[in-house]
Amino acid sequence: STNGGYSTDSYVDVPKSGTATDTILAYSASIDVGVTQTYTVEFIYKNDEDVDQSDDMGKTLSGKLFITEGTEEPTLLSQILKDNPTRSTRSNNNNGTNDFATHLTTTTTGTLFTSTENITGITDSSKEVYYYAGNTTNNWVKFANFYWRIIRTNHDGSIRLLYVGTSHDTTEGNIGKSAFNSPGTSPKYVGYKYGEDTSLDTIRNNTTDSTIKTYIDIWYQNNLTNYTKYLSTSAVYCNDRSEGTGQTYNYASSPKSKFNFAPYYRMDYDTEGATANPSYNCTDKRDAFSVDNTSAKLDYPVSLMTADEIAFAGGVAFQTMSTPYAWFISNSAGSQVSSSWWSLSPDGWNGARSCVWRWDSDNAYLNIVDVGIDDAVRPVLSLKSCIKYSTGNGSPETPYEIVKTESGC
């Protein structure tokens, strides 16, 4: 419509058949009482040189346009909100108690927790996000023939998923093992991508792929390229290389001088999680990896879970988690889903080697480790906000599944 009615620049595939088939062109279009609107419907015939279309010559396109009362298919997000009616928050100062100082492993099925996300240079303000924490059992998704767990929503409304594997009861919920970066003999190697190590600015030039990014990208190419249309290209994966408070990056002038990045303090390395204060914010655009961000550009819409996301989900640094486990390390049988696995969050430079946060499955806590060792890799990706819900209730036996379409939405 050109006079205030429904309008869109996207196209719907119309089936080519001798039998009349209903195709919905638009949902939730409304016309106020007493108002006249004019609509133009455009049909485009695609010229596909790989398909013999000679049978279509001389054929006629016909049909009827009509308006009917109906209900739009729910999005996956709307179904998640419906299935989890309870809202809660976690804080580092909840009436004097730090909720993030102890593991959250209580049953939380039916509850979504809320927080905010702000990406400096990308979002104009903080956006509310929903996340799962504790021992929830209804955040399972089956997508692209793999099982995933929902981590949270993102600033763009997309839904972030953590890889589980080919079955919900697996204990090998990873795509294999890789170093984060090899070698690890410079602070630049905490980067998912990185530049030269002259300064904090130059390591953020992001000209070189990390070892683990290359590993994940190859897996994506082999398994998920046909599903890219369902994935958000604006969702951000934050590889936070901000200096910690009181820390100075001076590697060029003093290579053996130790310093820590901001996640070291948010996870509270020094007092083992007692003052942990995780955040979904990303304070430098050059750390905010996404397909759309030219300052920190991904080749494919996939990366890793951050240490902050692990802390929000119920994990704590250097404190052993007992069963029942929080959802992010648990399979459907209640066992740990994977051996120790990488996060995306830098820890620091110890004067000789770079370190990154990981989930230590042997001790069941957040820990730091040299970037050069081989650890398990659990990819993370984000389903578009417009993705339609198909079936499922989020349980491992009946996971959420999405509507498959030509456009993705």
Annotate each PLM feature.
Residues 2, 7, 44-46, 68-70, ...:
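Predominantly extracellular/luminal cell-surface or secreted proteins
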Residues 11, 28, 62-64, 147, ...:
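Well-ordered beta-strand positions in beta-sheet-rich domains
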